[in-house]
Amino acid sequence: MPVIKVQTNVKKVSDGFEVRLAIHMAKVMKRPESQIFVSLDMNSRMTRGQLTDPLAVLDVTSSTVLTPILTEEYTVALCEFFSQELALDSDAVLINYRSLSPELIGFNGHILTENRPFISTDRARFIIGVLGIAFLAFLLQFLKYI
């Protein structure tokens, strides 16, 4: 459940910016749109050194492990999005990534680990398949004696 917090001093952010960001990042992160949370704080007083040019600072928090490969992919996608939407150069966008353990995130009245299955669907299918084959082998051996 990624959470993307955006702070910017850009004066005019078009309506629906946060929705478009959620849709864009759902595709990039390969997650359902309903799992992407976006918070937008516009017209923040911001500076980089003595410069007060338009900037954006993002905090991206996720319950999945964030690897350098993923954060590079996300950074490219976010910088392209902010360039198109807010006309910000990539050096005007700072992104802080945080990976939290699922038990540190609460949603829908529970922590995320409570909503996860004990084993994955693929693993369960594999186990059921192996048990089915073992049962058939046993049954064939049993039928030899009848």
Swiss-Prot record:
Single GO BP term: regulation of peptide transport
Residue ranges of the TM segments: none
Domain of life: Eukaryota
GO cellular component, one term: nucleus
Coiled coil, from the record: none
GO MF term (any one): cytokine activity
Similarity comment: family membership: Belongs to the MIF family.
Protein name, UniProt field: MIF-like protein mif-3
Provenance organism: Caenorhabditis elegans
Gene: mif-3
